[in-house]
Amino acid sequence: MSVKIRLKRMGAKKKPFYRIVVADSRCPRDGKFIEEIGYYNPLVEEKTVKVDSEKVQQWIKNGAKPTDTVDRLFKNNGVYEAK
């Protein structure tokens, strides 16, 4: 089972916000997930990212891979250092 840290789209049409979740890579984008570890709201003037960094570090240590978008969000918000 390959585990990814990715975005799950929520909200209404043309007004999205995203939950940052840990999910099996074979599950659909908005389908079943293992754990919710934060959220991202791109629509407010100052984009909001709230993440439980301890859970992120734990999942990465256990082998979860963040998607490119989530990786960029984490680096821009200081969840972990750029390599």
Curated annotation (Swiss-Prot):
One record GO biological process: translation
InterPro entries listed in its UniProt record: Ribosomal_bS16, Ribosomal_bS16_CS, Ribosomal_bS16_dom_sf
SUPFAM superfamilies, A to Z: Ribosomal protein S16
A GO CC term attached to the entry: small ribosomal subunit
Pfam families on file: Ribosomal_S16
Molecular function GO labels: structural constituent of ribosome
Keyword Ribonucleoprotein set for record: yes
Alphabetical UniProt keywords: Ribonucleoprotein, Ribosomal protein
Family membership: Belongs to the bacterial ribosomal protein bS16 family.
Classification via HAMAP family: Ribosomal_bS16
PANTHER family given in the database record: 30S RIBOSOMAL PROTEIN S16, SMALL RIBOSOMAL SUBUNIT PROTEIN BS16M
This protein's name: Small ribosomal subunit protein bS16
